[in-house]
Structures are given as structure tokens and as C-alpha cells.
């Protein structure tokens, strides 16, 4: 977010930050924790209420497995831990037949965040 950097002006005090993550695998490579990620985002943005976290990721398997789907193996995914630290978040399933319900929920979370957002 440096003035001369390629992302100059990306973080603005007059705008929400909407972070969207899409994955079909668990993060096993990161050396830090969801708490570290949360702290970094809040430090950069200044207010957790000015952030909307969205994630489409594997869910716990219910019933017969769907072909070509990845499932949460029963442990709490690190991205799930991260998004739930923020007051505004939505989570979708990588194996969903449609992503429309997820994005409708996501749009609702953004609207909720906008309604309570006071630009800095």
C-alpha cells in the first residue's frame, strides 16, 4: 500500500476491505497462524469491522462423497478459523452445485458491514 508501490491506494480509510479466498485444499505450508493473519489484516486496515472475509473451501463430508470433491477431514480449516475472527464473514463449499447462495450471503455481509461502517 506504499504510495509508489503497485498497490498504491489499495487500502483506503473510506472503503471496506473485502478479502475473498477460494481453495480446495487445506493450508499445511504456512509457518504462521490464523491469529497472526488476523493481526496483520487488522493492523493494515485499522478496524476488524471494516473487513469482510469470504472463503469458499472444503466442508465436512455429509453422506456419500461427491465425485472429484475435496472434504474437510474433520479438523477445523485454518481459513475457517481466520474468517470467523471477523464480525463480517461468509463461507461457501467448493463442492456446492451452485455458488449463487454463497455470493448472495456474501453480498448481504458486505451490505451489513457497509451499514455499520464509519469511514476513517
Describe each model-derived feature in a short phrase:
Residues 1-118:
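Extracytoplasmic, non-cytosolic globular domains
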Amino acid at each position: 500500500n506504499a504510495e509508489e508501490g503497485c498497490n498504491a491506494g489499495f487500502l483506503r480509510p473510506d472503503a471496506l476491505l473485502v478479502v475473498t479466498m477460494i481453495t480446495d485444499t487445506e493450508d499445511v505450508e504456512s509457518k504462521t497462524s490464523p491469529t497472526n493473519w488476523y493481526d496483520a489484516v487488522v493492523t493494515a486496515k485499522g478496524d476488524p469491522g471494516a473487513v469482510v472475509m469470504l472463503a469458499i473451501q472444503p466442508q465436512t463430508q455429509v453422506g456419500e462423497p461427491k465425485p472429484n470433491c475435496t472434504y474437510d477431514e474433520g479438523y477445523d480449516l485454518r481459513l475457517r478459523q481466520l474468517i470467523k475472527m471477523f464480525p463480517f464473514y461468509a463461507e461457501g463449499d467448493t463442492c456446492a452445485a451452485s455458488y449463487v447462495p454463497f455470493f448472495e450471503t456474501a453480498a448481504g455481509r458486505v451490505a451489513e458491514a457497509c451499514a455499520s461502517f464509519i469511514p476513517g
